[in-house]
Amino acid sequence: MELNVLLLLLCLSGGQVGAVEETLMDTRTATAELGWTANPSSGWEEVSGYDENLNTIRTYQVCNVFGPKQNNWLLTTFIPRRGAHRVYVEMRFTVRDCSSLPNVPGSCKETFNLYYYETDSNIENKISTFWNESPYLKVDTIAADESFSQVDFGGRLMKVNTEVRSFGPLTRSGFYLAFQDYGACMSLLSVRVFFKEMPSVVQNLLVFPETMTGAESTSLVIARGTCIPNAEEVDVPIKLYCNGDGEWMVPIGKCTCKAGYEPENHVVCKACPAAMFKANQGMGICAQCPANSRSTSEASPICICRNGYYRADFDTPEAPCTSVPSGPRNVISIVNETAITLEWHPPRETGGRDDVDYNIVCKKCRADRRACSRCDDNVDFVPRQLGLTDTRVFISNLWAHTPYTFETQAVNGVTNKSPFPPQHVSVNITTNQAAPSSVPIMHQVKATMKSITLSWPQQEQPNGIILDYEIRYYEKDHHEFNSSLARSQTNTARRTGGRVWMFMSVQVRARTVAGYGKFSSKCGFQTLTAEDYKSELREQLPLTGSAAAGVVFIVSLVAISIVCSRKRTYSKEAVYSDKLQHYSTGRGSPGMKIYIDPFTYEDPNEAVREFAKEIDVSFVKIEEVIGAGEFGEVYKGRLKLPSKREISVAIKTLKAGYSEKQRRDFLSEASIMGQFDHPNIIRLEGVVTKSRPVMIITEFMENGALDSFLRQNDGQFTVIQLVGMLRGIAAGMKYLSEMNYVHRDLAARNILVNSNLVCKVSDFGLSRYLQDDTSDPTYTSSLGGKIPVRWTAQEAIAYRKFTSASDVWSYGIVMWEVMSYGERPYWTMSNQDVINAIEQDYRLPPPMDCPAALHQLMLDCWQKDRNSRPRLAEIVNTLRPMIRNPASLKTVATIPAVPSQPLLDRSIPDISAFTSVDDWLSAIKMGQYRDNFLSSGFTSLQLVAQMTSEDLLRIGITLAGHQKKILNSIQSMRVQITQSPTSIA
């Protein structure tokens, strides 16, 4: 089966295949009477004759040249069209020269007319109504290139004329041909009716089916192609255009061989043999399996690792399989009281990898070492416990006089693939005596006007018998060098001799035979005020009175703490209450989500936490650089969240050495995007802020920015496809407008396109307030960037008045960019020239072949009065019926000859500067077509100004980009001729 397919593809791909002519009728093959109908009967006559090769043929002849007002009709039989949209008629005939006929009146002719009548049924019952011109459609008047005379006739010199005419479009089941003679002496030797069909073709791993030509000579019929077996699509959908002359144009789209297959002669994808592989789809060839791997079957996309060898998750299929490392060597331990330093040499075998790291396993053991358990979390490892790249680690905060076991593991990228534990080396140590750990907390037991009583719990690691405690006191705002010291044999202390309402800071530390531990953290306490004098008197009363006073004091402390707590809570609530009140004044509908500016938060990080999801950096894989932004590079990568499938993402990074303001500005875009949820708005996946570099992660758009995507595919989309893109952009902007969000930088470069041609609004970097007091003539924004003058409304440039109406103006410019396939608005004009022209009511002209309805919508968006511009919801409602009714887009806009209306293309030179067609073509860099113009008769600029796209095709200019450039110049030429009717060449 595969061999048969291969042979078929090889046959189809051989050489350039031209159109096939499928015959519908051919009188040369007739062996009996043709049976055509003639009227009157004295006109056309069917006879048997001979062609120039003396083959017997059935012909029709007529020669009533001596009678006046001849009107002889000849009607063929019904001809089925067999699905053809356009048919061709090849007529072979001879005509007698009227001047060679003696005494012939002036009614003698040397031409005849060809007509056709399209029908679904036979017309024999109403044949009488067909002997005049009214029911027919005229194809052409046929004239002979050569005629014969009496001398020629006597010498049997046949001067046969061959003419081919075509007509269409055809929609009925079939048609009749009619020949009208009105005074000629001629013979219709043969008539062949045929249509053109493109045969199947294989090009560059693409297969295109048989395709009929279009109904018009300029028609381009799309043939949808498929990939050959074991190939897959790349880029845009596959198609090939068949022109009206039956020629295949350049194919669009691409197929490449699947993983496991390689191309052969560009017509088949052949499976990789055993012991070879191909990992990715593409035009690459199969390769030998990498080291320590093998493939046992054909068409392998990857080679399987041999036993004991593995590939890491991040290894490519082209990478060799590797193994785990051996254990570290020569481990040395240095114990210092309750800390230890471990050092070692790298393993002898790295497993063939260069990503060897080290892990430390800490175990605390009993004195006899018969049982060990994992160390507590408070043990410190410097620089860290896992993923060490150096061969040294410092471990502290261990228990004193305690046996420990430390395992030093060597790991690499495939250790987690092995079923066995990592190779390691163990060392056993016992810590020495050490000073006690610090006191964790202090409590105030009692306070008077001049004294404070304190207590504290025993520390977690006394590391021996506590001999005593040292307490350090100093007043608030005094340096600790001005402190006073006291000692206590217990875990309580009383400070006396203070002042009324004195605030003091207190620290305490314990002492063992190993010395003092560290001082505790500072704790603040204070004596009572004069108003609490009664409390001091109660201290001198019996025990009952003292107890009562203590109860009162404790209650007051609880009350104060409650009041303070409520005050803090109220303060926090008040901040959010103000914020909610501020944002509830928007114009959104009830229940509609309203945009919140992240710059209104006192702490911008709070906005990031509220609107953006934090993503662990281990879930992110960076693959390649795809661009650079204001804050750093942009990458393509992969995101694999738990319990979710892996997806492609775009990753914006914050470059090193950033300031806090740059970090805030960078993350503000995530705070903005995180508030949006719409199919035409770029989706935020999350942010990475807890590691470096800081990242913003969004969905990945395969086709990139809209402007460059359109330029790369110039002329490749239908008007309906372009309007569909515009409707998607408008829907996204409508959503933003309903959230009371103003974009401020809407342009085709800030629209991203995915593989399904869905357009999504992106780049929210300029969408924050501009400085109101700036007087910089370059219109510097608060970001330090420039206002995009070519896309910005008049009031936004002049007064910094950014609204949804100014976004509508920008949307009109985006429409112009889309319909012009990514041309630069206002071409090479300077920003100041653009501003001046707009103020004088100049507007952009319609792009080539732009529907009038779309250009009118652009002009509506560019109304000087912002209140007169359509709302984004109205724009969506305007575009929707255009897609449903493509007929509304057939009327193409033209440039009016009124200077106050659309702006002229300033990049095209003045027509008066040219003296010839040659000069003009050289000026627009199209001099290679000089001979095409001159040989076709377009020898003056006056004639060139009348040319159409059909004329360009006819003279051999087939490249869409060149047609567009020449037609733009011709369009400008017409306007300049109309406005300044001077004499031109």
Curated annotation (Swiss-Prot):
Residues 20-542 are extracellular. It is an enzyme of class 2 (transferase). Residues 620-883 form the Protein kinase domain. Disulfide bonds: none annotated. The keyword Ribonucleoprotein does not apply. Phosphorylated. Autophosphorylation is stimulated by ligands. It is found in: Cell membrane; Early endosome membrane; Cell projection, Dendrite. One of its GO terms (biological process) is axon guidance. InterPro entries: Eph_TM, EphB1_rcpt_lig-bd, EphB1_SAM, Ephrin_rcpt_lig-bd_dom, Ephrin_rcpt_TKs, FN3_dom, FN3_sf, Galactose-bd-like_sf. Residues 912-976 form the SAM domain. Glycans are attached at N336, N428, N482. Residues 564-985 are cytoplasmic. It catalyses: L-tyrosyl-[protein] + ATP = O-phospho-L-tyrosyl-[protein] + ADP + H(+). ATP binds at I626, G627, A628, G629, E630, F631, G632, E633, V634, K652. Receptor tyrosine kinase which binds promiscuously transmembrane ephrin-B family ligands residing on adjacent cells, leading to contact-dependent bidirectional signaling into neighboring cells. The signaling pathway downstream of the receptor is referred to as forward signaling while the signaling pathway downstream of the ephrin ligand is referred to as reverse signaling. May play a role in axon guidance during nervous system development. May also play an important redundant role with other ephrin-B receptors in development and maturation of dendritic spines and synapse formation. PANTHER family: EPH RECEPTOR A5, EPHRIN TYPE-B RECEPTOR 1. This is Ephrin type-B receptor 1-A. It comes from Xenopus laevis.
